Structure formats: C-alpha cells, structure tokens
Swiss-Prot record:
Its EC number is 7.2.1.1. Belongs to the NqrA family. One of its GO terms (biological process) is sodium ion transport. This is Na(+)-translocating NADH-quinone reductase subunit A. Keywords: Ion transport, NAD, Sodium, Sodium transport, Translocase, Transport, Ubiquinone. PANTHER family: NA(+)-TRANSLOCATING NADH-QUINONE REDUCTASE SUBUNIT A. It comes from Chlamydia trachomatis serovar L2b (strain UCH-1/proctitis). It catalyses: a ubiquinone + n Na(+)(in) + NADH + H(+) = a ubiquinol + n Na(+)(out) + NAD(+). The keyword Plastid does not apply. It is an enzyme of class 7 (translocase).
Amino acid sequence: MKIVVSRGLDLSLKGAPKESGFCGKVDPTYVSVDLRPFAPLPLEVKVTPGDQVTAGSPLAEYKLFSGVFITSPVDGEVVEIRRGNKRALLEIVIKKKPGISQTKFSYDLQSLTQKDLLEVFKKEGLFALFKQRPFDIPALPTQSPRDVFINLADNRPFTPSVEKHLSLFSSKEDGYYIFVVGVQAIAKLFGLKPHIISTDRLTLPTQDLVSIAHLHTIDGPFPSGSPSTHIHHIARIRNERDVVFTISFQEVLSIGHLFLKGFVLGQQIVALAGSALPPSQRKYLITAKGASFFDLLPKDIFSSDEITLISGDPLTGRLCKKEENPCLGMRDHTITLLPNPKTRESFSFLRLGWNKLTVTRTYLSGFFKRKRVFMDMDTNMHGEKRPIIDAEIYERVSAIPVPVALIIKALETQNFEEACRLGLLEVAPEDFALPTFIDPSKTEMFSIVKESLLRYAKENVVTSS
C-alpha cells in the first residue's frame, strides 16, 4: 500500500550531523535503564545497589503482570536506583564492564510454541519493547493485538535513518536478515502478519518479508513517520477494544538479534546534534544503550547554562537540565543540544523575519512558498502564553484529521469521553509536538496530552486489564 501525506511541515534544522560523520565506538562507563516510559504501570525493582548483573538480567517486573521483566542491556554493577516525585521510578544506573557482553542465550524460534515464545518474550525483556494503542502505554500481556505496526519511516528531526542503524552489523544484508528474523518472531508470537511501514528510498528484502508481513510505503512531510499516521491510513482505531501494538525498527533488530545470534543487542546508534554543539562534534556514534552523556559529549558543555540538553529529538525529547548525570532514554537515539539565550532580540516585533518560521504569516517568510524551512532553533518562547484564537492552524500541520484545539480543551477539563469522541484514541503525545511548536498561544499541548493519557491509563486501562 502506498500512502501519501500532504499535511505537515518539513523542518530542516541547523545542527544535523553529517551523513558521513561516523566517529567510531564509545564504550561508556555508566549506562542507565530508563523506566519513565513505564510510568502507567506499577513496577517492582528486582535489584539493589551493589548487585552484579549480566546482559538480559531482570531489573524490574510488572507488578500487575508477573513474569514480564525489564532487563539489563549490559554486564556490570548496579550503582543507583533513581526516583523522582512521590518516589516514582526514573532509571536504574549501572557501572558497565568494558566490552560487549558474552552472555549466551539459546532459543530455537522454529521449535518454540506460541505459548513458549510468549514466555521467552516476557522473560528476556522483549515484550517490554512494544507500545499499545489506544492511549500510548506499554503493551499489556493480557491483550491480543488486532494489528502490529513496525515503523521504518521515522522522520523526526536529527533521528538516525534505517541505514545508519544497520551500521551496527558487519553488512547491510546481515542487518536486514536479523530484522527478518525479528519480524518472524513477532508474526509467530501474535499469530498475524504485522504491518511494516517504510519509505520509497529503502530497499527491503521483500522476498523474505512478503509472506510474513504487510508491506507499505509512505511519503510526505513530518510527521508522516508517526505511528499514528500509519494506523490512521491502514487500519484505524475506532474504539477502545481496537488494540494495536507498535514497535520501531531498532527494537525489532533487538528481537531478531537474540533469536539469531543468541546475544542481547546492547549497542545502538546515537546522533549528536543541535546548533549549540560545535560542527566538529556533530556526528554518529556506536555506543551502549542508555549511555551516559558524560561519555559522549565534551565536558565543558555540562558547565554552561546557555545550552539545553535533550535526550531525543528537539520536538519530543526529554529535557535533562535538572539531571546530574543524564543518560539516553529507552527509545532515544539522539542527543540534542540547543542554545538557551539569556537575552531577547531587540525590537523583534519590528523585524521582517525573512528567516523566521511562521505558519500564520506573522513574518515575511510566511508569504513565500519554500519547500523546506531552515532555522536555527533555540529555547526562546518568543512571547508569553495567551488564549487559543485561531484553531485551524494546528490542522495544517497535523497529519491525521483530528480537531487539535478541541481535544486539548476537553483534556484540560478532564472530559475524556468527549476527547475520545473527538479522536483521542488515534493519537499519542508525539502527534501534538508540531502543533505545540508552531502554536502562537504557547500552549504546552504535548505535555497536556502526555499527562492526560498517563492519568487516564492508570485509572481505567491498566487496572481493568
């Protein structure tokens, strides 16, 4: 199936790493296992500081669904269990042993029954890789998904491409074969053909995939790479019982690697990007999952209050300004550094704004059609919060036809029934990143949706499963 998306906005941000900018491998001293994505679920920590762990060792377990573990990606020693407000679990920090783990697993995918395969996924931390829609929560083992969507079309700013992720392996063919094994495992686990969404420029091993998966291509501006866009165009979610799972290309590689090679895939590709990072430092690295920023970035960056650190892309990533030793998030493959200006631009309201981004034609740049928007992004808000007046501008950049402003108003009044009727079942917080970015009213839509979905999932979805 060929999908063409017309709505959205391609952001060409300054600070992207060069496509040829690989700079070897970095073996970090510390890594963390990010537990923030599991906030809707109560977790039981299985380790204490001082414990020795190996790659694949259980670190935490779903309290309500025993036997589902979150596992360590590396060998090492647990040094800290970080908690936030109300003792909420944030991450488990591990002092990594040098080198790659040699812990061997032996699973024969062909001989495993579906029930046995589910137990392997739960035990080895593979089930924790899936996300569940509606409500964008960690996948629950009590649910049988109607569909599974595998995303190979992620086009968030600075995010490494599929080709970059294949650089982990000896050859592109080897990487794709591992991916095929991962797809086979998913198809067998759920008894269905998953949907694989890629772009036209990717050359997939279609002869190996066509019999076990539905293949689709998508073309269009950001956010055409969002799973919500794929689900909307291929098989819409129409009610809360329409459960679908989503998973990324990198996570499918982790699944295939365990079954084919017998080892936990503890490494990942990371893009160092952002206009606050010197051009010579903008590059791609091969490092351990959850690596500490201190091992990847120049040391002088951490003492500057004019730089904002983000784990992930600049639109949906996690702000790390209050963290003493920030580490990569669970699903993050980018470290973004943005300028944090301390002064305002003089007479900014009188300037023509030829190089400023505007969707409402506030600046001169809005009157000229340009295929791509080039901008030097920083953390300046360019104004204070104000009431929402023009609700139509959000629909111009939203890839799926939902009334953005009405959903936000329903969520702010905690009217979840109305929000679901308007389209909340189809969306995730990331779908509101671009409307938040271009919003003249400065409303933190991304945070509102994220917190609302978390609250609703805790009270209604998780406890009833």
